[in-house]
Regions:
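Short, small-residue-biased leader/transition segments that mark boundaries at the very start
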Residues: 1-2
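Residue at a conserved register position within TPR or TPR-like alpha-solenoid repeats
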Residues: 16, 67, 110, 144-147, ...
Length: 206
């Protein structure tokens, strides 16, 4: 019940933050911390990780989301990177000890603020750890799309053109984008559980 109760507070904190209700998000964050700091969290095991280790990942994730919605973007990125570090340090589990890769949020919010190269690095790293992860596929596609526009001098048609300052670079981006889009489309249309349209790498992104 400890992990379940904490997870409910975690989910509510993220939901309130992304609905713009920062005070409610902070209240849920405090309630989450009550469970996270419970001494029993160190003694309880969920598969291969302690509950304390799992909840330690969630704490900077919550604070990072809240900070971002408050406009404190650099503080948010620092917190989310800390959450990524903690998640990467969890013991191997099958299924994963934490089912939501923090990189979804980190990459998506970096991209939202125009940090295209940093976001691309985040998504590529996640795809190495979680091959064909549709959320990171979408994030990487969005990064490449933005790079394509920059390469074309601000064009928005998504196709290589004679005005491109670097035709070979444009061609490489277009080719990879098409491959990723095919992979994502096949994945989302071939399974009975793929019934949700992924529009962003994370639901926290606008």
């Amino acid at each position: 019940m400890l992990f379940r109760s904490a997870s409910l507070r975690y989910a509510r904190a993220l939901a309130f933050a992304n609905l713009g209700n920062i005070e409610a998000a902070k209240a849920e964050s405090k309630a989450f911390d009550v469970h996270r700091t419970d001494p029993e969290a160190e003694n309880r095991i969920l598969h291969n990780n302690t509950v304390a280790a799992l909840l330690a990942v969630d704490a900077p994730m919550i604070r990072g989301e809240i900070a971002f919605k408050e406009g404190r973007h650099e503080a948010a990125f620092k917190l989310l990177r800390r959450a990524v570090q903690l998640q990467d340090g969890l013991h191997y589990d099958e299924p994963w000890g934490k089912m939501q890769p923090i990189r979804h949020a980190l990459g998506g919010l970096l991209l939202e603020q125009g940090h295209v190269e940093k976001a691309e690095e985040v998504f590529r790293t996640d795809l190495k750890r979680h091959p064909k992860n549709p959320w990171s596929l979408k994030g990487l596609i969005d990064c490449l799309s933005m790079q394509l526009k920059q390469t074309q001098g601000g064009g928005s048609d998504g196709l290589a053109c004679c005005g491109s300052s670097n035709p070979s670079e444009t061609s490489a981006i277009v080719t990879e984008m098409k491959e990723l889009e095919i992979l994502l489309t096949e994945q989302r249309t071939s399974g009975e559980f793929a019934d949700y349209e992924i529009r962003k790498s994370c639901a926290c992104c606008y």
